[in-house]
Amino acid sequence: LRKRIRLHQVRVGMFVEELEGTALDPAKPHGRFLIKSSLDLDRMMASHAISVVIDTQKGIDTDTAFPPEGLNPAAFQAHLHSFFSGEQIALAQRAIEETRPYVRNVLVQAQLHHAFQFDSACLAVEKVMSDAMSTTSALIGVAKLKDKDEGTFLHSLAVSALMITFGRNLGLNEEKIRLLGLGGLVHDLGKMVLPVELLRKPGKLTADELALVRTHPQRGYEMLKKEPYVSNAVLEICLSHHEKFDGSGYPHGLAGNDIPLVARIAAICDVYEALTTVRPYKRAWTQAEAIDTMIHSTGHFDPDLLKAFVSRMVISGTIH
């Protein structure tokens, strides 16, 4: 059975019948073939095909774990168990519980005293970095299930884990990966000094409310820079993770490579995690929907980094 899919939906185990919208190149895959490895996936991404025709009788189909009517917590739990063993999920849940006191201390101290607990943040990041890759991948999935009281904690932890995992897949050294994890953990620290009712407002924000929310990168940056041990990379993530590649972001309207690399990485991980969050009161987006939206958000993300995220994190099956 032939089926047309988007390039980012391709997985190892699929049988490709045809690449559409790309010139044939001997150095790139074309014709009919089975995708056997991550190297094949990288070559597929390099083809820049508009769409891919697969044969679902000769290879695997696209993910159909989610019902078309949307994602709810029960459906997502079943989805997790289709990718991770009960032991991996239990290890991920334990990792979340072990980091909870450290991350909560960071958030509470920021909220009550406008201060950054550097030691607590470092302990949380070390815990995530010490876990096996499979546990970290499961943690990213488990952390998508959020209620209103756990949202900030789990989002901060999940973005940190995403940035650590992406950094490893980009081949960065351990110190740079550690800084990515720390930056991911505190990227929204400035929100802790904003009114809670504003952050939880269900409807559309007024212009004044939106302007206030958009002060959180600068507020977080001011809080972090009081701590002498915080590196420039962490400060850059906090201050610039809402900048957009075309210059339309905030707070400073930076564009292209003027946006620090670490902040461009953070922008991708932050948006992906937010889009795929599963809440009891809100339909979450599937991974395919989130990636499709991000790919078509022209000007928002560094296109090369986004391509790497899709290839090395999504298509490779590192995250689900």
Where are these regions (language model features)?
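Alpha-helical hydrophobic/aromatic positions enriched in membrane-embedded helices and signal peptides
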Residues: 29, 179-180, 262, 294
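Helix-turn-helix-type domain boundary/helix-start signal
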Residues: 33-34, 170, 203, 228, ...
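Divalent-cation-assisted or electrostatically stabilized phosphate/pyrophosphate-binding catalytic cores
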Residues: 44, 201-223, 244-320
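Acidic/His-rich, divalent-metal-binding segments that scaffold phosphate/diphosphate chemistry
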Residues: 76-214, 221-233
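Short acidic/histidine-centered micro-motifs embedded in hydrophobic/aromatic stretches
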Residues: 124, 145, 180-183, 216, ...
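A glycine-rich, aromatic-flanked flexible loop/lid motif
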Residues: 183-194, 233-242, 261-265, 281-283
